[in-house]
């Protein structure tokens, strides 16, 4: 295919939350295809400023050459839980990887809980995914990314490659955390894979002032009880806590992320997480 022929979609969704009238409001939204959102749900009467929003895909996943973005802005004092309706499939990409960039800004005393379901890498899938988080003083956030692989034909065919990037900085531009990871599908599935026998991977950052953070042992134990192998440690520059999860499959990984995120949610909000149907 000639290089000058564009393939894939170019779209960026924008969600802006503000505090007003004793609650949080989705005051700014731009949700082009293939994105779709539900109306905000209010699941915590004791904390009316905390709302829940489901982000959905109308297209069946990420495809060759896609360039999709998600911008989330939390205004001062606002609080939101943004999640997905289901896992997102990344389809065969050939020589044009799909790209997904998430940019998050959390203002002073705001809270964001953004724990999407795993990205499922099909055979031949190539993906580059980045997450950039900007924090103002007093901001709190729980943000995750996760991948699993699946061959619908059951032949064990690997994905092509995946690249993950994370950046966390202050509103003044000071870098707190920066990391990148890359692995080819053949390495991921190899007998000497750096993941050992595990076939799903997740990462979560729990960000906020030190007195608000959960007990690391409690978070790790909650994830381990689901069948995951979890490890948690402080992030550089006192940014918060960083969790890594390994799991045998995407379902176990999702359960581990939910368990760990629930402990983080409770510590940062003082509330037990409400059941969210999917």
Curated annotation (Swiss-Prot):
Gene name of this polypeptide: ureD2
Biological role: Required for maturation of urease via the functional incorporation of the urease nickel metallocenter.
Protein's UniProt keywords contain Cytoplasm: yes
PANTHER family: UREASE ACCESSORY PROTEIN D
Taxonomic path: Bacteria, Pseudomonadati, Pseudomonadota, Alphaproteobacteria, Hyphomicrobiales
GO molecular function per UniProt: nickel cation binding
Assembly behavior: UreD, UreF and UreG form a complex that acts as a GTP-hydrolysis-dependent molecular chaperone, activating the urease apoprotein by helping to assemble the nickel containing metallocenter of UreC. The UreE protein probably delivers the nickel.
Subcellular location: Cytoplasm
Pfam family of the protein (one): UreD
Descriptive protein name: Urease accessory protein UreD 2
Family: Belongs to the UreD family.
Organism of origin: Methylobacterium radiotolerans (strain ATCC 27329 / DSM 1819 / JCM 2831 / NBRC 15690 / NCIMB 10815 / 0-1)
Keywords: Chaperone, Cytoplasm, Nickel insertion, Plasmid
GO cellular component: cytoplasm
């Amino acid at each position: 295919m000639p290089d000058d022929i564009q393939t894939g979609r170019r779209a960026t969704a924008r969600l802006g939350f503000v505090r007003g009238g004793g609650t949080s409001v989705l005051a700014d939204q731009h949700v082009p295809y293939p994105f779709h959102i539900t109306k905000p749900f209010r699941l915590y009467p004791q904390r009316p400023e905390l709302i829940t929003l489901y982000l959905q895909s109308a297209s069946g996943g990420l495809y060759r050459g896609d360039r999709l973005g998600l911008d989330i802005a939390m205004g001062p004092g606002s609080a939101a839980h943004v999640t997905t309706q289901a896992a997102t499939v990344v389809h065969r990409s050939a020589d044009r990887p799909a790209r997904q960039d998430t940019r998050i800004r959390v203002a002073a005393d705001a809270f964001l809980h953004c724990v999407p379901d795993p990205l499922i890498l099909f055979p031949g899938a190539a993906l580059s995914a980045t997450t950039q988080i900007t924090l103002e003083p007093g901001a709190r956030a729980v943000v995750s990314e996760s991948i699993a692989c699946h061959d619908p034909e059951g032949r064990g065919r690997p994905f092509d490659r995946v690249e993950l990037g994370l950046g966390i900085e202050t509103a003044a531009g000071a870098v707190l955390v920066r990391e990148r990871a890359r692995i080819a599908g053949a390495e991921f599935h190899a007998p000497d894979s750096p993941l050992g026998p595990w076939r799903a991977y997740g990462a979560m950052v729990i960000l906020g002032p030190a007195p608000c953070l959960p007990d690391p042992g409690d978070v790790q134990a909650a994830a381990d009880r689901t069948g995951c192998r979890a490890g948690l440690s402080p992030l550089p520059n006192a940014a918060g806590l960083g969790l890594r999860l390994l799991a045998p499959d995407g379902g176990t990984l999702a359960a581990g992320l939910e368990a760990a995120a629930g402990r983080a949610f409770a510590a940062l909000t003082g509330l037990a997480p409400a059941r969210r149907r999917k």
